[in-house]
Amino acid sequence: MRSLPSAVTVAIIGAGPVGLMSANLLGQLGIDVLLIERNAAPYDIPRAITLDDEGARTLQAVGLDREYLPLTLPSRGSRYYDDAGKLFAEVGPGPTEFGFPRRTQIFQP
């Protein structure tokens, strides 16, 4: 294990999507960042199912939109059921505004 620096401007705990993106954005601004993750490798089980238009714009800000967005599918909406099988929420696909679909689905085999 590498030794940790004695001082950094920003420490981020957790290398999930938010931690990774935050470290990326701060690094592009020239800010020294320490990203700490307890797991040695990413989870191999799919967990995220959608990306919204704000997430797409964030990917665009770091130059990843053209690489990532072709891997998504336009959302047709979602229905959410409780453990008894009762529908408790329904979300439509939403309009495409500001250059990106409101929601896209992430294909995870």
List where the protein language model places each region.
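A short alpha-helix capping/helix-coil boundary motif
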Residues: 2-3, 33-37, 93-96
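Beta1/beta-strand and adjacent pyrophosphate-binding region of the FAD-binding site
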Residues: 2-18
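A generic fold-level signal
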Residues: 5, 43, 72-73
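Short, cationic motifs built from Arg/Lys/His that form the positively charged side of catalytic pockets
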Residues: 19, 38, 108-109
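Short alpha-helical segment within the catalytic ATP-binding CA
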Residues: 20-21, 53
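Active-site-adjacent segment of FAD-dependent monooxygenases/related oxidoreductases
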Residues: 47, 51-109
